[in-house]
Amino acid sequence: MKEPGGLSLAMIVKNEEMFLADCLRSVKDVVDEMVIVDTGSTDATIEIARSFGARVIEIEWPHDFSKARNIGLDAVSMPWVLVMDADEELVADDADKLRQAVFHPTADAYNIRIVSVMERAEDISESYVTRVMRAHPALRFRGAIHEQLFNAIVDAGMSLGQLDVRLTHKGYLGSVMQQRNKQERNRILLEEEVTKHPDDFYMLWQLAQTYFGTARYDDAIKISQRALKLSSPNSPLWVLAMTTYARSLLQAGQPKKARRVLQEGQLAHPKYTDFWYLEGVVLFQMKAWGQAEASFRRCLDIGEAQGYLATDTGIGGFKSLYRIAQCEIMQGEGKNALAYLLITIKQQPQYRSAWRAIFEILIGSTMGEVLNTIELSVGLDQIINTLSTWPQLDDNEQHLLECAKEKVQEQNLAGV
């Protein structure tokens, strides 16, 4: 008999020895079984999976992500399923929330937060994706790539909730993307899907995203326009397609048109911070410093976007503070800019660009004076811890680190 809140892990993998152990370790005390579909690994992936007690199903790659995922869903034995990728990890603090959600369910499926980390610590993005669901035969993935469950949930008359449970995702790190040739693979599969399903809004948007990611901005614009003709502001994905469209226009050298698109988005979704932030970026590129600053201030008023499927993390806080500082610099207000930069690194100490901007403003000051200024916002220990995590420090960063360490030693000797 199935345990009422039993939870299965379902995954598809191929040559994931780099990440798989960390992934499985993060959920081994949360899930009741692991079902892993391997599509042709030639490294240690299968051995790693079995070392965690996983049941491994070996298949040939069907050139369809949904088919592969659904083989795993067909094989689970628990009443609930957690779907993960090998380059993801469950945040330890969220384990109890996940268990509570399946033991005391309020919905038939849940969107959870995917937190994608990038090369730079401050470049984080978040999206909500359906990854927890009942093990019900009607709930099966659709789409050969960027497979999703939403339509299956709707067709089955089931409910979709939202959980504040996080998976960290490392797959968009530049080194990983390059190794896997991920974008080229995605492009081919998405173009095939769009040929088969020319009116599939979701696939069109994903193809536009892929074109944008490979600097094919004109193609991204055309596909975004096609997608948006099939949607309306009421669709959860509409705001995402609009931001892709606006970003593509900006990169293609059409900032005025990009702004018009963003203003249309603001009218429909005034609380979607990303529209205001991107407008600020557009206006900054147009050298309209005061107007750009007003847009970034609006981001601070709104805060992080709530209730949307994806947002650029930090634009309701430290990223907009940094952008305001840039606007102040361009308007000749260095002191104001410095104040905003100090608040920026207080909110997000890893925001390296802000530190470097501080060095630029304080050029001509001694490093001791720079350190004293930064200490108004960030403590000595935090300064040392932050700088120590960065690879290849430049001269200013190295000098500041040494200065901070010397000051700590002096304080220790003085018994402070």
Locate the predicted segments by residue:
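A conserved acidic beta->alpha catalytic loop
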Residues: 26, 38-50, 61, 85
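Short, well-formed alpha-helical segments that are part of the catalytic scaffolds
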Residues: 10-33
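Acidic helix N-cap motif at the loop->helix transition within catalytic regions
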Residues: 18-21, 43-52, 93
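Conserved donor nucleotide-binding strand/loop of the catalytic core
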Residues: 46-71, 75
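Catalytic-site signature of metal-activated, phosphate-bearing donor transferases
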Residues: 67-73, 84, 90-222
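Short aromatic/hydrophobic "clamp" motif used to bind/position activated sugar donors
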Residues: 81
